[in-house]
Structure formats: structure tokens, C-alpha cells
Amino acid sequence: MSKRYLAVAGAAALSLLLAACGSSSGGTTSSSAAAPSSSGSSSSAAGGGAKVGVILPDTASSARWANNDAPLLGDAFKAAGVASDIQNAGGDKTKFASLCDQMIGEGVAVLMIVNLDSDSGAACETKAAAQGIKTIDYDRLTLGGNASYYVSFDNVAVGTAQGKGLVKCMQANGKTTGPVALLNGSPTDNNATLFKQGYEAAIRAAGYSITADQSVPDWDNTKAGTIFEQMFTKANGNFVGVDAANDGLGGAVIAVLAKNKLAGKIPVTGQDATDTGLQNVLLGTQCMTVYKAIKKEADAASALAISLAQGNAPTTQLGSVKDSKTGKDVPALLLVPQAIFNDSVKDVVADGFTTAAKLCTSAELKAACTKYGVS
């Protein structure tokens, strides 16, 4: 998928939402803004008024929550003059529930959550709905919940991009058939289910067999290394490719392969376009990652939250996704992901998501950056 298509699709989707926000502002600063502390941050509107609460999930599954989403959302609310309380649950369901109760008690008009699992997320949304609070599922759909809206990327498309990317890399490696391992995300995360739906279909459609298939609780990278090492040992290392559901899991796979002198010889996927993931792609130990332009996602979600907090309803031009647990359609805005290979890492830098200085940090990486036009 070209960078131009990504930009056009994201901008078109966002313009629909911004049009619904009337005179409210959804602008943000760049992702290089300083992240709030792990305890979260609060801001007050200059003129008082409604408040938006945001609960992010953790800091371990991905660096994005602290480094990107928190500052982007905070800057957007501040620019619009809307008070906000942005907190991180730190992967703790008890803390998540406590933050939910705290924000409901504060009288937030809108509550945006990234659930740790659907059960705890649904419990929070049920409490919020009872108080007339509008809720937004951000990035992850809460199955069985009461979300008023859902803003995310098309997560089946994310998985499809991974699967097709892995197929491309395996074929480039001269392997047109053979055994593939799947290292999936957390079994309690609906996104992980959708990612797998996409990449498993793409891999099977290309004629490969899936001979190992394991999920990683809580997206824990340490557990991922242990799980993949067991998979690798059981299969005697006989894999032609590994679909790892994100860059953190991919890094765990690469570490096991490196111990067996196979890093770069067996293609491995990832997702999130983290700095480490992009470096692995440049070095050839990871064949690809999936770039989800978090700024576009944060822009869309903050614009929606601002509109709702100001008493405005979005237009009916939003699409919808079906909650597989309740059968209900949830109004949704889904953005388009982009597959990133070594020759398109420069697109992520050009988009302002990261910088060459963060990626090109060693002699080997500087050489790779020069080779692939990362500057």
C-alpha cells in the first residue's frame, strides 16, 4: 500500500469526523511531544466546561501508549480548550477499574478507554453508561461493552498486511511452501483475534501450512520468548517463516533465532513500526512491520471526544463494526494501515512518526539507513 493512499484514506476519514465537530478543534502537535508521567496528566479548560477522561492500557505491550497516544491526545484537548484527565492503567485491571470509577466520579462527559480485556472494559462502560457518559473504545473494541463509538485501524487489514508481507518475504527467500509459526497477541484482546484472522487467511491462501500456533498472555515479550523457544525446539527449528503479531513479539522471536544463528534467515513479521522494530527491518532480522499512523488515530479520536464533550453529535457518515458478543453494531471510524519493508522505512520517518537520529544509531544501522534512504 502506498504512502499516498495511506495519507489520502486517513485524511478523508478524518475530514468526515472533523466536519461533524462544528467549530471545535482537533489539532495536535507532533508525536515528539513529551509524554506525561506514568501516573498520567490532567488539564483544565480555560473557561471550564465538560471534561474528557482517557484510560490507556499499559506501557509494556507497546511504547506507543506513553510516547505517542498520551501526548497527542493531551495536546489536542488543550488546543481545543477542553479539560482532560489522561491516565495509564499500567497493565493492572484493578487500577483500570479504579481509574474508571475515579473519572466517573469526576463527572467526565466523555470517557475514552483502551481496554485491558473485554470483561473489565465492559464493566467500566456499563458504569459510565448508567451515568449518561458517552464512551469511546479507542484502538480496541470492547466486546460486550456499551461503547458509543469506536475509533481504530481496520485490524483485519492490519493482519492481512502482515500475512501478505510474510508471504512476500518467504517467497523472496525461495520458500514457496512450508511450515509457518504463528505467535499471536493476547487471547483477551479482540484486536489480536482480528489480526490473526487477517494473517492466517493470507498465509493459508498462499499455500503454506501452519504447524505451530500460540498466543502470548498480555502481549508479554518475556513470555513470548519462552513460548517461541518451546515452539522452535518442538519443531526442531523447521519453520520457513514466523508471523509475530507485533514488533515486541517479533523481537522475542528474533532473539531466539539469533541464539540459533538463524536471525535474518527465517522471515519474521511485526506491527506498530516501533523504533526497535524499524531497526530490525533495516537490519534484515525482521522482514516487515505494519505502520499505523497513530497521530491520525489520535486526531480522529480526540476530535470525536471534543465534539461529544461540547454537546455535538458526529454525522451518520461513520461506518460500523459488529460486536460479536452482543450482535450490536457500534458506530466506527476505521483507518488504513501500511505495510513497511526495508525500502519504505523512510516513509515512516517522512511522516514524522520517528526520526533518522532515533533509528540510525550504530555503524551497521547508519549503513542500512544510507542504503534505504532514511535521512
Q: Where does each model-flagged region fall?
A:
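Hinge/cleft segment of the Venus flytrap/periplasmic-binding protein
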Residues: V8, G48, L183-P187, N191, ...
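Bacterial lipoprotein signal-peptidase II cleavage site
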Residues: A20-A34, S38-S41
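Extracytoplasmic "Venus flytrap"
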Residues: A46-G47, K51-A97, V114-S118, N184-L194, ...
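Hydrophobic alpha-helical segments within soluble ligand-binding/sensing domains
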Residues: G48, V52, F96, V151-G178, ...
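Short, solvent-exposed amphipathic alpha-helices that sit
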Residues: R64-A79, V158-G165, N190-S209, I227, ...
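Short beta-strand elements in bilobed, periplasmic/extracellular small-molecule ligand-binding domains
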Residues: F77-A89, G178-L182, E200-N221
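Hydrophobic alpha-helical
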Residues: D101, G105, V110-A130, Y199, ...
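Flexible loop/hinge segments that line or gate small-molecule binding clefts
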Residues: D119-A157, K164, K168, N173-P179, ...
